[in-house]
Amino acid sequence: MTASVLLHPRWIEPTVMFLYDNGGGLVADELNKNMEGAAAAAAAAAAAAAAGAGGGGFPHPAAAAAGGNFSVAAAAAAAAAAAANQCRNLMAHPAPLAPGAAAAYSSAPGEAPPSAAAAAAAAAAAAAAAAAASSSGGPGPAGPAGAEAAKQCSPCSAAAQSSSGPAALPYGYFGSGYYPCARMGPHPNAIKSCAQPASAAAAFADKYMDTAGPAAEEFSSRAKEFAFYHQGYAAGPYHHHQPVPGYLDMPVVPGLGGPGESRHEPLGLPMESYQPWALPNGWNGQMYCPKEQTQPPHLWKSTLPDVVSHPSDASSYRRGRKKRVPYTKVQLKELEREYATNKFITKDKRRRISATTNLSERQVTIWFQNRRVKEKKVINKLKTTS
């Protein structure tokens, strides 16, 4: 089955890829023979036309069919030969066609392919009509067979004739090819190279690429063999980083404090405390920053009023508590004397002992609690031993 598909990748110009599915060996061999026969017939017609033009004899029947114009007949024969060669070895060229334009031609593998004479006649008629139209200055009448043959056998002519539209980029311009020109089939030797004349390759290079850099060497080295493979869309002009909608791709906003200051953003802030900040480069997103950058207290700061936290003294803290300092003998003597008088201290006595021993009221209260617990343990131990 022969298929001609126009793909629409994400390129500047649409690219045409011609795929040939080798349904059976006999059909493929017969098609090749027909193409060779068409090329031979076209070459014979060209030779006859040239002989008739040079020797002054009677024109060839192909020339007579073209209206006695020997140049038209020669052009038709040459076009038929080129069309046969192009139909046999098609390569993928970026054709500046309309995005919606697509053409598909198929022939079932079981059907008999057209004969060589019919193919040559159709190609010659199409080329003769085109030459007559160009010589007369107007669009000459073209039959359906000629248009069909022109569309089917001249895929590369669209790229060569599009001088008004933007020039498409060739293979190797972005570091990767467009599409492979290969014959797909079950046989291992199904992939064949697409050979074209050096003049056509040079004209294509002069028109569609800059031949001043290393790309020219690559193109010239591949002018005779274009059996390359498509490397994917990795090097395409549209294959760049595109941010996913709903996500913001930008670096972290630096802190508003000093270089050594740590930021602790409070959790659960309402959206009213944020104001939108327009982003550069035209991104369709907004970043929200708090209006007031508050500095909450450190988590390890003690809740006691008499404890002062210092970052330099962090090693002396344990879970936010001050390191235990044993009481002096003078302090213990004053506390023991008051405990012997009364095991439960009053508010006035607590203030007096705090002022005398240079201890806080909380420390005095805790000492009395611990002293009662200690005495209780001692009494319980004596009871158990006795």
UniProtKB/Swiss-Prot annotation:
Q: What is its main location?
A: nucleus
Tell me if Repeat is a UniProt keyword of this record.
Answer: no
Q: Which Pfam families match?
A: Homeodomain, HoxA13_N
Q: Where are the transmembrane segments?
A: none
Q: Which residues bind DNA?
A: 320-379
Q: Which family does it belong to?
A: Belongs to the Abd-B homeobox family.
Subunit annotation: Binds DNA as a homodimer. Interacts with MEIS1, MEIS2 and MEIS3.
Q: What does the function comment of this entry state?
A: Sequence-specific, AT-rich binding transcription factor which is part of a developmental regulatory system that provides cells with specific positional identities on the anterior-posterior axis.
This protein is called Homeobox protein Hox-A13
- Designated gene of the protein: Hoxa13
